[in-house]
Amino acid sequence: MILFVLGPQRSGTSAITRVLSLCGGTLPAGMLGADTNNPLGYWEPRAAITLNESILRRHGSNWYDPSLRLLEGDAFRPVEKADHIARIAAYLATLPVAPLVVIKEPRITTLSGLWFEAARLAGFDVATVIAVRQPQEAVKSIAKSWHVSPALASAIWLKYNLLAEQYTRGVTRVFVEYANLLDDWRREVKRISVTLPNELSTGEEQAVEDFLRPDLRRQRHTGPVADLFGTDWVSAVYEAFRAAAVDEPVDAPTLERVFESYRACERDFRMAFQDFHGLSNSMLFRVFPPVIAGPVMEILAMAHRRRGTWA
């Protein structure tokens, strides 16, 4: 079985993945190492990062793309989709032989359909953990790590959470809130374990305790959720995920409402901005800047003897 850890960057996915690997899960080889943004390691395979980024860029996207362009019907031609799935399956064939392999790479969230299909074709069962984090904490962490605006960070948070929920409908899944993991990791491991055919172990307790240091949570927010975009999208999604993280029923109607609203607005604004940039970069705008367009209009007015509509 492959247990995919899904969700936005800076939402506790690294901590969840490492804890799972210390409780009986097996990690792929070739991890992305620690850095100043993640001093205890990312616990995501370099090969998966390269593979996902190549797919995203081939289709005009990347990990920080807030759009849902890859959900559009013509995003993947059948031949392209088959090629992507084959490449993912080839990577999965290199995984260590183990009852439970844990894979975390945030871009997988946006490409879950391809990864899940490849995993099943390769003979793996699929289960998922969806990381949940208070949006202000995640947004501040994303903004600080990548030097982006809170608006883009919030859109990324929304997109990845919405896609994680959409793609895992009908798949074994557990919502795990980052704060809950830090508060009582044994409880959260047990919640995950009961959904899996092979029970997780807490035999490496000291290693987990040493890893889950209090300073791991560098962004803390205890106030109300700040909504952006003139909507309740952020707060509504967080409330639904937060409830699911304590085993309450998933609020599917609310999540579907937000998903469809985000999708419609994002698509329309994307088309509008594409047209804007297209016009701004058009030959007409390049050839006729105001210093030239003004005299040209005066010549046309003279040609019409400044009469009628040219008066």
Q: Model regions: which residues?
A:
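Conserved phosphate-donor/acceptor-positioning beta-strand/loop module used by diverse small-molecule
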Residues: 104-108, 122-142, 157, 176
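Short catalytic/ligand-binding loop motif for oxyanion handling, primarily in non-cytosolic enzymes
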Residues: 11-17, 109-112, 136-141, 182-186
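PAPS-dependent sulfotransferase catalytic core
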Residues: 1-84
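Lumenal/extracellular "mature" regions of secretory-pathway glycan-modifying transferases
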Residues: 144-156
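Glycine-rich phosphate-binding loop used to anchor ATP phosphates in small-molecule kinases
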Residues: 78-116, 120
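A structural motif corresponding to the C-terminal end of an alpha-helix
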Residues: 91-96, 163-174
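The conserved 3'-phosphoadenosine-5'-phosphosulfate
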Residues: 32-39, 130-135, 140, 169-239
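PAPS-dependent sulfotransferases, especially Golgi type II membrane carbohydrate sulfotransferases
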Residues: 194, 198-311
